[in-house]
């Protein structure tokens, strides 16, 4: 007779490391599921959570925390008119601005983090230092099993 299988991941060690370091680099199984399991555990611990992709993020700090302008993609020959050749600037609210309202801790999970440069990843670590309620998890690629480490350790900073 086999013993019952224990829970695969309670999230306590992950949460402890996240709170100690602020910014974690994660390698998750490619079949998925680990992200939502961990985010559910963080929500249960009182975090407000959001998941986004690193692709198209632009300047991470500005896109995450400040109101900023974007232009529509350039589609070739357009009438210049009153806007620039690439269109009018549209103001966009920050991705996590609404999550930072209140006193709750915030966890942001960034998918496809391997497309970010070293300086962009370091700026995410600095952002966690400046905003003590913010915790950032950056998925840096796939692995056979879930593993994580402090982002600064991955970058050698």
UniProtKB/Swiss-Prot annotation:
InterPro entries: NAD(P)H-quinone_OxRdtase_su_N. It is a peripheral membrane protein. Its EC number is 7.1.1.-. Coiled coil: none annotated. Keywords: Membrane, NAD, NADP, Plastoquinone, Quinone, Thylakoid, Translocase, Transport. One of its GO terms (cellular component) is plasma membrane-derived thylakoid membrane. It is an enzyme of class 7 (translocase). It catalyses: a plastoquinone + NADH + (n+1) H(+)(in) = a plastoquinol + NAD(+) + n H(+)(out); a plastoquinone + NADPH + (n+1) H(+)(in) = a plastoquinol + NADP(+) + n H(+)(out). It is found in: Cellular thylakoid membrane. One of its GO terms (molecular function) is quinone binding. NDH-1 shuttles electrons from an unknown electron donor, via FMN and iron-sulfur (Fe-S) centers, to quinones in the respiratory and/or the photosynthetic chain. The immediate electron acceptor for the enzyme in this species is believed to be plastoquinone. Couples the redox reaction to proton translocation, and thus conserves the redox energy in a proton gradient. Cyanobacterial NDH-1 also plays a role in inorganic carbon-concentration. NDH-1 can be composed of about 15 different subunits; different subcomplexes with different compositions have been identified which probably have different functions. PANTHER family: NAD(P)H-QUINONE OXIDOREDUCTASE SUBUNIT N, CHLOROPLASTIC. Belongs to the complex I NdhN subunit family. This is NAD(P)H-quinone oxidoreductase subunit N. It comes from Synechococcus sp. (strain CC9902). The lineage of its organism: Bacteria, Bacillati, Cyanobacteriota, Cyanophyceae, Synechococcales.
């Amino acid at each position: 007779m086999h013993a019952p299988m224990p829970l695969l991941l309670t999230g306590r060690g992950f949460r402890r490391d996240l709170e100690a370091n602020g910014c974690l680099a994660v390698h998750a199984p490619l079949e998925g599921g680990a992200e939502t399991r961990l985010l559910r555990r963080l929500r249960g611990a009182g975090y407000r959570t959001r998941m986004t992709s690193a692709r198209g993020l632009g300047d991470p700090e500005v896109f995450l925390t400040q109101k900023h302008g974007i232009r529509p993609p350039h589609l070739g020959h357009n009438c210049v008119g009153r806007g620039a050749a690439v269109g009018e600037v549209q103001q966009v609210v920050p991705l996590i601005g609404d999550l930072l309202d209140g006193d709750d801790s915030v966890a942001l999970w960034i998918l496809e983090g391997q497309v970010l440069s070293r300086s962009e990843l370091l700026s995410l670590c600095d952002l966690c230092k400046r905003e003590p309620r913010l915790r950032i998890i950056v998925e840096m690629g796939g692995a056979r099993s879930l593993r994580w480490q402090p982002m600064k350790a991955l970058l050698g900073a």
